[in-house]
């Protein structure tokens, strides 16, 4: 693939802020996409976190009032959704991965429908729900039988799915045409990604492979990677207000989008930031290699069926199904530099260089770095091509 056949090399910026997402120090209308997974209300591991943010949560739990605790937990999250609505551009998308909870409170077992509560509060701040995705997760066979086992009528259905809620801020938007074209996905990916049931994602205890095996994420890398490519274009900015282990940042880096993440636990940011460059490069290379290989296999299968795709990729010189795919280019990561005071990037350069991003940096210009310690990276992108495989 010649260098003239793809997009110009560009830089994206990525900032992680140790701060409270209920007060995002970001300008209005400054990010195009939000991809996140909040703490799940009524999952007991998050009780202490919610109670610290809202004492009424702890009081309700102590009183055995599960319904009141559920509402107060979602009131905490509602402040974040209000900020999400404020910083999203008109037509911007928010994707929220959330699961419902089952729990016994004061001797009474029941379902707490987190997905419905998130939708309700997002609608209240002006976000419009679109068709969502059910992420069906492999079930734990030991937990299949809840309640009375084999005896009716008191057994319970086992939850084996979570939701990816998709919400839009206003009407549709039209990014620049050239960026849309090079950010296209393959025809067969369109059919898979935009299905309303995903069964091909590994669950939360997934071990990351190769250079990132020692780290795990709140959700598998493929989820934010897929959503970033579905709902934004290269050079735009992605926000994750519940940064966690940084999987959305990794997906944005791999996809040539800028990103901002907020995380309450400063120690978590400090512990994970140094690993991001190596993780991003490994994940981007592996995922893009896989996408090209899967497309070539798809073409072989079509030809075996006597059907030849009608167009040809400019960058990769293989057949594609539609005219919209002709300018598709997968971005490479050429270098990652850490440019805050925290340390060096993976190419050994020091953190003394300014922001030279050619796109998507409008969400990075606020004073949100003042909210707390964090990390900032500049990523140089090229074109992932045949020579990289």
Residue map of PLM features:
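Eukaryotic intrinsically disordered and solvent-exposed regulatory patches
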Residues: 152
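Extended catalytic-interface subdomain
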Residues: 175-180
């Amino acid at each position: 693939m010649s260098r003239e056949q793809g997009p110009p090399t560009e830089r994206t910026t990525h900032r992680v802020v140790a701060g409270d997402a209920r007060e995002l120090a970001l300008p209005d209308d400054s990010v195009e996409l939000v991809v996140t997974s909040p703490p799940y209300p009524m999952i007991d591991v998050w009780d202490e976190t919610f109670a610290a943010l809202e004492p009424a949560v702890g009081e309700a739990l102590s009183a055995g009032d599960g319904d009141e605790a559920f509402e107060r937990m979602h009131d905490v999250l509602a402040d974040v959704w209000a900020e999400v609505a404020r910083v999203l551009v008109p037509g911007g998308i928010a994707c929220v991965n959330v699961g419902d909870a089952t729990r016994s409170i004061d001797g009474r077992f029941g379902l707490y429908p987190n997905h419905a509560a998130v939708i309700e509060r997002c609608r209240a701040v002006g976000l419009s729900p679109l068709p969502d995705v059910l992420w069906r997760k492999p079930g734990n066979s030991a937990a299949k039988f809840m309640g009375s086992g084999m005896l009716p009528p008191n057994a319970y259905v086992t939850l084996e799915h979570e939701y990816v809620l998709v919400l839009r801020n206003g009407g549709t938007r039209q990014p620049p045409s050239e960026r849309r074209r090079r950010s296209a996905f393959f025809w067969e990916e369109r059919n898979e990604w935009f299905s309303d049931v995903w069964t091909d994602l590994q669950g939360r205890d997934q071990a990351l492979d190769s250079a990132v095996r020692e780290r795990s994420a709140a959700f598998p890398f493929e989820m934010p990677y897929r959503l970033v490519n579905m709902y934004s274009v290269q050079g735009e900015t992605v926000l994750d207000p519940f940064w966690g282990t940084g999987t959305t940042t990794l997906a944005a880096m791999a996809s040539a989008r800028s990103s901002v993440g907020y995380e309450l636990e400063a120690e978590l940011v400090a512990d994970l930031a140094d690993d991001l460059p190596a993780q991003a490069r490994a994940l981007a290379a592996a995922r893009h290699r896989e996408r090209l290989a899967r497309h070539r296999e798809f073409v072989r299968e079509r030809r075996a069926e006597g059907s030849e795709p009608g167009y040809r990729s400019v960058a990769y010189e293989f057949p594609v199904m539609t005219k919209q795919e002709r300018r598709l280019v997968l971005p490479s990561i050429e270098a990652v530099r850490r440019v805050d005071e925290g340390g060096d990037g993976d190419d050994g350069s020091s953190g003394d260089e300014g922001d030279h991003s050619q796109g998507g940096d409008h969400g990075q210009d606020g004073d949100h770095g003042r909210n707390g310690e964090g990390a900032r990276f500049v990523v140089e992108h090229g074109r992932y091509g045949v020579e990289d495989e």
